[in-house]
């Protein structure tokens, strides 16, 4: 799946983001999807991310596929707005996701700052 049209502005692939997200979902069980619901929503996300980016694939064609998968999620019990909101939220998070390496570096910096503050008595 590693294609430019599945990457965000930081060059991070949607696949890496989905793996990262699934690790958090397993920890917190925030989303309680069936396999079919997850399939439909993740595919809607995929087409939303790549819409207008894949060579020789019109934006409208990918958005048509997005709608097909949203409709599938609705058939599986989601309200349309609920499915669309989930996809929009995941897309907005993905667009700013800098990858696991950047996330771990940010956590290291925060820990270091906290330790420095403790040493200085803050």
Segments and roles (model prediction):
Residues 1-122:
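Intrinsically disordered, low-complexity regulatory regions
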């Amino acid at each position: 799946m590693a294609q430019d049209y599945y990457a965000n502005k930081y060059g991070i692939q949607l696949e890496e983001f989905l793996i990262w997200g699934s690790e958090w979902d397993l920890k917190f069980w925030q989303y309680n999807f069936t396999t079919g619901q997850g399939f439909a929503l993740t595919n809607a996300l995929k087409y939303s991310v790549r819409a207008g980016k894949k060579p020789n694939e019109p934006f409208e064609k990918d958005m048509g596929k997005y709608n097909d998968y949203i409709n599938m999620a609705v058939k599986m019990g989601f309200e349309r707005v609920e499915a669309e909101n989930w996809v929009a939220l995941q897309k907005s998070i993905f667009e700013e996701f800098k990858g696991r390496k950047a996330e771990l570096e940010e956590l290291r910096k925060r820990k270091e700052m906290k330790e420095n503050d403790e040493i200085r008595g803050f």
